[in-house]
């Protein structure tokens, strides 16, 4: 199974590195194309087994899976010079580019996947959304298997892609904003910035682990640490008075 990745930017490079660390696609079966040789040199310095090229058509020549890791406005331009064969699977990670738009470039018979990872993919901790068109159950499972090695992947209908992107791709920024705000509070209380960052980040990581590992509702875990008359309930009430929940929902 050979994979070509068009684009060696943040996402393309992270996917290539993740595949190289995984067990499904050998690094030697991954080819990355990018017009900027600097990005390719950095990638190959980390993973010498990965193949690199500045020519997109050369990258996809023998590929079974072609991953487009370019900005949405470059999709049509890239697809106009790379001509896919019917056996090749096209994977687009360009946000907002629909199957309808992709079909205009590659035709209605092509097997297509839309993927929305988030930036935690660089840490193999992405929440990746996957939708498919003209894909078999085996192809869908393969895509899930590949991206579950880069975090957690779920298969959803394209109609849910916009809403779920707000939870995952945008959501990671909202969590980081909370971390930043909590750090500022810690600094105001006299805690050194690096210490505050470590404390808050680990608390967020621990909270996520409670939900994922125990499969419980957040309200249950909140109740465990909310003592009547304690500081936690006072803080939670202050967040509610300030419109915290409403702001997250509206965002």
Predicted features and spans:
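Rossmann-like NAD(P)(H) cofactor-binding subdomain of soluble oxidoreductases
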Residues: 37, 47, 55-61, 65-130
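Short acidic-hydrophobic, aromatic-tinged amphipathic segments that line or gate anion-handling sites
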Residues: 51-56, 154-156
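NAD(P)+-binding Rossmann beta1-loop-alpha1 motif at the extreme N-terminus of oxidoreductases
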Residues: 1-54, 125-126, 187-189
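Small-residue helix-packing motif on alpha-helices
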Residues: 30, 59, 192-199, 221, ...
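Hydrophobic packing residues within well-ordered alpha-helices of enzyme cores
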Residues: 15, 19, 40-43, 78-82, ...
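NAD(P)-dependent Rossmann-like dehydrogenase/reductase catalytic/cofactor-binding core
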Residues: 201-251
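Internal alpha-helical scaffold of NAD(P)-dependent oxidoreductase catalytic cores
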Residues: 101-111, 127-164, 175-215
């Amino acid at each position: 199974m050979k994979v070509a990745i068009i684009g060696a930017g943040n996402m393309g490079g992270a996917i290539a590195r993740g595949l190289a660390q995984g067990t499904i696609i050998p690094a030697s079966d991954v080819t990355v194309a990018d017009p900027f040789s600097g990005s390719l040199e950095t990638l190959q310095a980390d993973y010498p087994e990965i193949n690199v090229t500045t020519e997109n058509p050369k990258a996809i020549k023998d590929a079974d899976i072609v991953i487009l890791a370019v900005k949405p406005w470059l999709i049509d331009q890239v697809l106009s010079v790379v001509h896919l064969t019917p056996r090749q699977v096209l994977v687009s990670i360009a946000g907002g580019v629909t199957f309808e738009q992709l079909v205009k470039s590659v035709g209605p018979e092509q097997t297509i996947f839309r993927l929305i990872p988030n930036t935690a993919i660089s840490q193999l901790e992405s929440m990746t959304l996957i939708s498919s068109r003209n894909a078999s159950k085996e192809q869908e499972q393969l895509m899930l298997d590949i991206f579950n090695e880069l975090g957690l992947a779920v298969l959803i209908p394209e109609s849910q892609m916009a809403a779920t992107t707000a939870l995952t791709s945008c959501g990671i920024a909202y969590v980081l904003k909370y971390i930043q705000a909590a750090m500022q509070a810690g600094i105001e209380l006299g805690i050194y910035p690096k210490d505050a960052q470590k404390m808050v980040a680990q608390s967020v990581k621990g909270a996520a682990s409670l939900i994922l590992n125990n499969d419980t509702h957040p309200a249950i875990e909140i109740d465990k640490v909310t003592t009547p008359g304690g500081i936690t309930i006072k803080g939670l009430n202050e967040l509610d008075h300030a419109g915290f929940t409403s702001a997250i929902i509206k965002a």
